[in-house]
Amino acid sequence: MAKKQNKLVKEETLETILFNCRNSLRGRAAMTDKRDLLLTLVFLKFIGERFKQQKEKIRHEIVEVQGINDTDFIELQLSRPNQYMQDGVFFLTDETFWDKLILTSPTGMAIAFDTAIKTLDDNEPKLKNALPQQIFTKTALEPGVLKSVVDEINKIDPQKFNDHDLIGRVYEYFLQAFSINADKEEGEFYTPHSIDRKSVV
């Protein structure tokens, strides 16, 4: 039985995951808040993936190419922001790194994500005034609901869904879903002007 369930999980499609995100938020927040919250989570997930990839690239360069195995030296290089920024990758601290954020207890998750957004806004010139502030506390979701949405977003694995424009597919799904159902004052053709997906692809 367990093997069968594991197989079903492995076969879960991207569209199923994204639908589950929307379904978890059904009737729980304003349409625009749900849209912004989901897009922000996707953004944090993908810059976290880029950060991990860059970290492994740096490690590979030091160990495999340069032949250096000094642990202290490796850790020092991995902690240098310029090693990431030179390739257009955001340098993330534990406070802003997806893999750390998702370990937060459900009751503290909204504050943790809002703090991450503020930190990025303060420290990354490219993201200044680009991300919605206090969106997680503003929506006031029950801790369990936010945790379930975060868990769904965490399933979006670039290694599993091998698509050169995966984040584009995810953004398009949410933007279409919420533009179709958006309030009239939002307009039918919502175009994101704040979060630039090019910064995470």
Where are these regions (language model features)?
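Non-catalytic, mostly N-terminal accessory regions of nucleic-acid modification and defense proteins
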Residues: M1-R197
